[in-house]
């Protein structure tokens, strides 16, 4: 690898919330040594202080990176979300400041799918309430409302990476799988796509949710939808906490419209393991409540640590932004002996003309150039002759619309 414009020992990584040590191993193997590793999230004031001199930050789901936080992150180049979701990050604020955000959208899919399937089996057998009764000295030895999973209908809402893997596992246990997605998807195995949300609700013994957090999915399962689930059905949510109205779900459990539920995500979650967890579902024996641990397995966390840290290394080493959630995706092959310039700018007319004008007027030959844009930002990676890189950088940073410009190596 070519020598970077900023020595790797001076590039600071701030890793919070005890991300898996595999991330640290990847960073060290790539030559990065300035790594601050903290096992918890930080209070806002301390986060502002710590992020001020960080070039990269790694977080999980508790740390909230707001526009106000980004205002204190003058050196920040990229964010690594060591999880699936990125709703804890103000993606627009990051993009406007030229900060790329990466995540691990697929690394914990198996873990979540296994948890959902296990919960389905436990709820069909009535294990949660039988377990609770035994702990209180009771003894409910009965086959009433106790069922095998084989032959049952599973309704999957959201047929993405988790939904599809769950579909395959469920079919292997003899379930009939139906799924609803806003996009037309290729069914795996013998799964069947249905045309509306109401169809899987009304026909399924178990309904499980696997949708992202968007304006469209917020409270998409309210009282009307919960009552549309067949009587004696089961609802599982391991997606996002804002998808299900929990008060309506609690009512449906109490009046026995549903025989059980499993919830892993909540509208408001404790910031730490020492805080009190509040929910209208507490105290209901036939509801499995788990503290947002769908993807919290040793295997998933190790994979997430590897995936996200490798993306951060690639972005730091050569400017590759492939799979960024808020940034144009660029990957320019290296040109030996050349220097690489990165230019992030507002997506407005004339910027590329001005960039190329700089090279033309100063007699600088371009060895390689890759531009991509999204609705707000343009990102171009340029390889030039080594002797001209400083001159080019000096000119590029003054172009109207420039957000960030630097010599990478």
In which residue ranges do the predicted regions lie?
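Glycine-rich Rossmann-fold phosphate-binding loop(s) that bind the pyrophosphate
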Residues: 159-160
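A conserved regulatory-domain signal marking ACT and ACT-like small-molecule sensing domains
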Residues: 322-409
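Rossmann-like dinucleotide-binding domain for NAD(H)/NADP(H)
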Residues: 101, 223, 232-234, 239-334, ...
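Phosphate-binding beta-alpha-beta segment of Rossmann-like dinucleotide-binding domains, i.e.
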Residues: 97-153, 165-172, 320-325
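Rossmann-like adenosine-cofactor binding region
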Residues: 52, 65-70, 178, 182-279, ...
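An N-terminal-biased, well-structured beta-alpha scaffold segment characteristic
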Residues: 1-102, 200-202, 222-228, 371-379, ...
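N-terminal Rossmann-fold NAD(P) dinucleotide-binding loop
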Residues: 20, 163-164
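Hydrophobic Val/Ile/Leu positions in short beta-strands of Rossmann-like dinucleotide-binding domains
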Residues: 13-15, 156, 343
């Amino acid at each position: 690898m070519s020598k970077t414009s900023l020595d790797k020992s001076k590039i600071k990584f701030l890793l919070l919330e005890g991300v898996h040590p595999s991330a640290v191993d990847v960073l060290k193997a790539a030559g990065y040594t300035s790594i601050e590793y903290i096992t918890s999230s930080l209070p806002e004031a301390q986060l502002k202080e710590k992020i001020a001199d960080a070039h990269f930050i790694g977080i999980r789901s508790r740390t909230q990176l707001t526009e106000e936080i980004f205002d204190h992150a003058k050196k920040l180049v990229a964010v690594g979300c060591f999880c699936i979701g990125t709703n804890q990050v103000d993606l627009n604020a990051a993009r406007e400041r030229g900060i790329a955000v990466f995540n691990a959208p697929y690394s914990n899919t198996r873990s979540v799918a296994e948890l959902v399937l296990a919960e389905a089996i436990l709820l069909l057998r009535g294990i949660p309430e039988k377990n609770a009764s035994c702990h209180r000295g009771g003894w409910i030895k009965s086959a009433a409302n106790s069922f095998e999973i084989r032959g049952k209908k599973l309704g999957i809402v959201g047929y993405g990476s988790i939904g599809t893997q769950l579909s395959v596992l469920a079919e292997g246990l003899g379930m009939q799988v139906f799924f609803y997605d806003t996009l037309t998807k290729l069914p795996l195995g013998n799964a069947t796509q249905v045309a509306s949300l109401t169809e899987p609700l009304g026909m399924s013994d178990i309904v499980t949710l696997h949708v992202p957090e968007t304006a469209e999915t917020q409270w998409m399962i309210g009282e009307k939808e919960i009552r549309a689930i067949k009587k004696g059905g089961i609802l599982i949510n391991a997606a996002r906490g804002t998808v299900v109205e929990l008060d309506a779900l609690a009512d449906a459990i109490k009046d026995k419209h549903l025989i059980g539920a499993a919830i892993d995500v909540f509208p408001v979650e404790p910031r730490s393991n020492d805080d009190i967890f509040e929910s209208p579902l507490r105290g209901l024996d036939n509801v499995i409540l788990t503290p947002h641990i769908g993807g919290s397995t040793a295997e998933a966390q190790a994979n997430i640590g590897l995936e996200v840290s490798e993306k951060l290394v690639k972005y730091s080493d050569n400017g590759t932004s492939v799979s960024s959630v808020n940034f144009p995706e660029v990957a320019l092959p290296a040109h030996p002996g050349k220097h690489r310039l990165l230019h992030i700018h507002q997506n407005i007319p004339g910027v590329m003309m001005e960039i190329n004008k700089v090279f033309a007027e100063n007699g600088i030959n371009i060895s390689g150039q890759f531009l991509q844009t999204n609705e707000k930002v343009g990102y171009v990676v340029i390889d030039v002759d080594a002797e001209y890189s400083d001159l080019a950088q000096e000119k590029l940073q003054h172009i109207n619309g420039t957000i960030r410009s630097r010599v990478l190596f």
